[in-house]
């Protein structure tokens, strides 16, 4: 095998197998395209996106690593979300979570999203 060469296994790889999956319908209420990456905490995605943010707390897009989903202005689509694993600690991003995602962390995140006005899908 040459340095840098790829060695691909045969068969099908199923990503996020055995993890909790949720579907959520998302609408871009803004005037610009919005792109969300594979490992972004979906509940904290752009405030112009209208969807059930409470359902999305502790979840990310169920897409291959390094990819994203784009939402055009006015577009509505259903996406699959998968639970964030590992230590379930969310830091940075839009500062709505910045916590460990347990019941208390979910309540804190939900309160921050409501206070910011992000539950309505409009930027204030």
Swiss-Prot record:
Catalytic activity of the protein: urea + 2 H2O + H(+) = hydrogencarbonate + 2 NH4(+)
Places the protein is found: Cytoplasm
Enzyme nomenclature, EC number: 3.5.1.5
GO MF annotation list: urease activity
InterPro entries: Urease_beta-like, Urease_betasu_sf, Urease_subunit
Pathway(s) it belongs to: Nitrogen metabolism; urea degradation; CO(2) and NH(3) from urea (urease route): step 1/1
Quaternary structure (record): Heterotrimer of UreA (gamma), UreB (beta) and UreC (alpha) subunits. Three heterotrimers associate to form the active enzyme.
Family designation: Belongs to the urease beta subunit family.
Full protein name: Urease subunit beta
Species per Swiss-Prot/TrEMBL record: Bacillus subtilis (strain 168)
